[in-house]
């Protein structure tokens, strides 16, 4: 019975998040109400409040959904070190995360996310957002860098943690460019990130 309840709860969450993502794009985050989200998801408004607390928390839950793929793939990425050059694999990790992110939230919806985080009076919103978008990706890049250090292909003196999170900040700048510059394509986004990965990681690569 407990398993059935959890399954039903997950199904309701999926319906709520789908409804919210559609309405945020159609009407804008500020003009969408919890009641409208509930009506489209065919649940009660108290259910939405119970699951997410606030509309802002629901928006951040959508962001977190886009980061699930990188967390699940983390062990696999480290194992790929034997078959990829360091720069190529780091770029692949970031590319995978970008694709997962855009599968979960459209470019238009990301515009609402950025605006919400920038204007929220809640001082905890921005740290939560940054931790969500950087945590899984940073951990995946760090694991890959350490795998290459163990293989002698990345300078052992490198602080893998610091470089990994520098790379997440670089990725975020390019991603924001993609959100703002409507003429920019996903392929151009990936190419820009790959160029910077080569510049940043290249000096630390060693012959294994």
Task: Name each model feature, range by range.
Residues 61, 75-107, 160-167, 190-193:
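Hydrophobic alpha-helical connector segments
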Residues 71, 84, 88, 104, ...:
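Amphipathic alpha-helical packing segments from all-alpha helical-bundle domains
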Residues 79, 94-102, 111-120, 199-205:
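Helix-loop "lid/cap" segments that line or gate small-molecule binding pockets
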Residues 15, 19-57, 61, 65:
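Helix-turn-helix
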Residues 9, 17, 59, 63, ...:
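Amphipathic, non-transmembrane alpha-helical scaffold segments
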Residues 108, 127, 131, 149-197:
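Hydrophobic/aromatic-rich alpha-helical bundle segments in the mid-to-C-terminal region
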Residues 1-11, 78, 208:
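N-terminal intrinsically disordered/low-complexity leader segments
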Residues 12, 55, 62, 66, ...:
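Hydrophobic/aromatic residues within well-ordered alpha-helical segments
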